[in-house]
Amino acid sequence: MKHTRRNVLKGASVLAAAAATGGIAVPQAEANKQPYPKGMAHGLTLLTMRRNSSEDYRLGVKTEKGILDVAAAAKLLRIYAPETMDDLLQREHGPALNTLVATALTAAAAKPAFVKEETVEYGPLVSRPAKIVCVGLNYRKHAQETGAQVPKEPVLFNKYQTCLNRHNGTVKLPVDLAKKFDYEVEMVIVIGKEASNVPEADALTYAAGYATGNDFTARDLQYETGGQWMIGKAIDQFAPLGPYMLTADLVDPDNLKLECRVNGETRQSSSTADMIANTRHMISYISRYIKLKPGDIIFTGTPEGVIQGKPKDKQVWLKPGDKIACSLEKLGELKFELV
């Protein structure tokens, strides 16, 4: 017990000096530039990982020393910390995680808990969201390229837990059901505290962090079945997400460059500054109608450049073997292959 208490106090003392994020130690004053939910971690680049296929996926933190295996570090240092992303988001154990990370960065005993990033297998970034809310037509040029009216308020649809997929994973194309497969790079909001009818001015304080996602779509099912957006977008594995979630204090969500590449060719290139509904408005608007819970995620819309927006004679739909790479500034590059 004394050993545990010493470690907790030591972690608390160094926490003010640094937090691990993106491989760089960030002064606490910088980490506090953006608001974040009480009970949520801050100043961190988070991921879900495992060291081999026989293990369960668990929480990791990207640091300048490598990927910190949180469960391993907690055991070595005898300090409590949430072991999964879902535990972190739904149980408000962020301060405990920050203490563990700060302690591990300076404690020799924690050295075995740091591993090289290339040796880990990424898992689904968030695995148990109660809701996956998606915003459609949220970039003016994308609405125009698809022949849709520019919406006055966010257009909402949903995906399901079975859609979630991981970085460096595969998306199995249901070729018996559809033929017109398309990409959509998007910024994803991860909710950090319960949000119901929240004012727009406070909305960012409900975001735990942000990630890179792809709202993968079967266009023929979306448009040629009477406008069944859900069927075209909610097929299993159609929501790749990752590799990281940056905590909200480290990100200006309305000023991030985003791109999508197919087999190395850039197809989409824009900025979240071009979103019609900004991050505050989306969170506030959705919360008027749907109570958001910690761990829920929001796909925020895609910019122009999708296959659906091209002239019909130039629409070359995605096929097995294609490799997709989606990147958002600061949030990392999400990669997956079609099979």
Task: Describe the role of every protein-language-model region.
Residues Q34-Y36, T217-V339:
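Catalytic-pocket segment enriched in acidic/His residues
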Residues A148-H167, Y183, P320-E329:
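Structural signature of FAD isoalloxazine-binding scaffolds in flavoprotein oxidoreductases
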Residues R5, A12, Q28-P154, K323:
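N-terminal non-catalytic cap/leader segment that marks the start of a structured domain
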Residues V61-G66, I191-K193, N263-G264, L328-K330:
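Short acidic-glycine loop/turn motifs at beta-strand connectors
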Residues R5-T21:
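N-terminal export leaders
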Residues Q34-P37, L47-M49, Y122-P124, Q144-G147, ...:
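A generic local secondary-structure boundary/capping motif
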Residues R50, L137, K159-Q161, N168, ...:
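Short, structured patches in soluble enzyme cores that scaffold and shape functional sites
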Residues M1-H3:
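Secretory targeting signals
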